[in-house]
A protein has these predicted regions:
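Charged, glycine/proline-rich intrinsically disordered loops and linkers
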Residues: 3-9, 15-18, 141-147, 179-188
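Class I S-adenosyl-L-methionine
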Residues: 3-97, 119, 132-136
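Conserved beta-strand scaffold positions in the cores of enzyme catalytic domains, especially
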Residues: 48, 125-127, 203-205
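SAM-dependent methyltransferase catalytic region
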Residues: 145-250
Length: 250
């Protein structure tokens, strides 16, 4: 695992670059170079981390409220703890694909956006979650005669109520109500949360499909998003099987 320190400089240190002590690994939006010290020692992350940035209450629960207002989520992880965890593995992999099989509030996707912002990377993340409602919410909805599958029930599920809005808010810099998010990101790469990220997100529903229909080629529309993901998630999704071809963005 690489332990790196990125140096964000407006003016390149020519001497250290010439000596090979530094190398340019990217550019920020303002044109300043992102430099990396050459020859740093490798290290295995420890099992116990301490520091203000790892507070799940301050940078997990309170951040959810900052991005989503009155909406809440139990025990979200610290954004910065998640960011550092991912960086310890993919800091030197700008094209990495990070898969979160139990995404919850979407902290992993948010952390990947921050890593890309820091070094100009093109990392992608796939967040997978169910749309369960909390136990308390389930009881309230049941008393009202609602059940799973009803639109009002589904609207309060974790995916619809927290994950999607949180990812959208992080990218746009605005709450679900359209208000600019207040505050700045801290510790590494500080900038206003309202600036958002130059990222894209698309949301899909996982469904069960008949294998025979897929094999016979009559379920192309249903599996088109998976084919798009498999091809690298670039350009538009070819939703219909028809003669001709489509050009994806390079």
């Amino acid at each position: 695992v690489y332990k790196r320190q990125l140096l964000y400089l407006a003016n390149i240190q020519e001497d250290r670059l010439a000596k090979g002590e530094l190398k340019i690994v990217g550019r920020r939006d303002d044109g300043s170079a992102i430099l990396e010290a050459v020859g740093e020692a490798t290290a295995i992350p420890t099992t116990v981390w301490s520091g203000a940035q790892f507070s799940a209450g301050e940078y997990g629960s309170r951040y959810i409220k900052r991005f989503l207002g009155h909406r809440s989520f139990n025990f979200p992880k610290s954004l910065y703890a998640t960011e550092l965890s991912i960086a310890s593995v993919v800091a030197d992999k700008p094209d990495a694909l990070i898969v979160d099989f139990f995404s919850g509030s979407g902290t992993t996707a948010h952390a990947v956006m921050r890593l890309n912002h820091q070094d100009g990377g093109r990392r992608r993340s796939i967040s997978i979650t169910n749309n369960e409602v909390s136990e308390d919410e389930s009881k309230k909805l049941t008393k009202r005669g609602l059940r799973q599958g009803d639109p009002e029930w589904e609207a309060l599920g974790v995916c619809q109520y927290v994950t999607k809005p949180r990812v959208t808010a992080a990218i746009t810099g605005k709450t679900p109500e359209g208000d600019p998010i207040k505050g700045d990101y801290k510790f590494t790469d500080e900038f206003p949360m309202a600036d958002g990220f130059e990222e894209n997100a698309v949301f899909f529903d996982l469904t069960y499909e008949d294998p025979d229909a897929v094999e016979l080629g009559v379920a192309f529309e249903e599996i088109a998003p998976l084919l798009w993901l498999r091809a690298g998630s670039r350009g538009s999704i070819i939703k219909y099987e028809q003669p001709g071809f489509a050009m994806a963005d390079a």
